């Protein structure tokens, strides 16, 4: 509780740079390689995706592995990005009657399950979220054993496995928190 929207905040922060790749450069590197990238957060997962020529697969995997473990957290950048997300919330939800209705419906329909909270987060949680919260979330959940790598296109499976091992293989697994089942009470 109190951290609704944290996954979405991390999605934004994942483009702010590592020791190896300065802030804002991730997308530029992909673009210079002839590709495009983006990300989105849903209720169950966050997706980071690149679309580029198969000859650039190693580049994409190297960049993803780097930001999985080497993300740089700047307090200034975090505050700036939180303001962007709060404005995004105002524009997409607070100023949109249909979005407000949908948000209220989910909060009513789900009494116990996390689906009751908006992906973007409640404004009060965003206003009170700190850099340490984001760092803890990143250090807890961003790990190869909590990641699904999907590669599709004209590629050889052996090449994908080899490159995935090369870039992600040295990243240690993390002990993930035990997830507790969220059982909804009967509704009448």
Go through the PLM ranges and name each one.
Residues 8, 48, 64, 85, ...:
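Divalent metal-coordination and catalytic microenvironments
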Residues 16-20, 51-82:
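M16/insulysin-pitrilysin zinc metalloprotease superfamily fold
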Residues 82, 132-167:
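Non-catalytic, conformational "gating/processing" segments within enzyme and secreted inhibitor domains
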Residues 7, 23, 27, 61, ...:
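Hydrophobic face of alpha-helices
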Residues 15-18, 69, 74, 155-158, ...:
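Bacterial peptidoglycan biogenesis and beta-lactam-recognition machinery
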Residues 5-18:
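Active-site SXXK
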Residues 76-80, 96-103, 155, 162:
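Non-catalytic accessory/assembly modules
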Residues 1, 20-56, 92-146, 170-188:
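Non-catalytic beta-strand/loop surface segments
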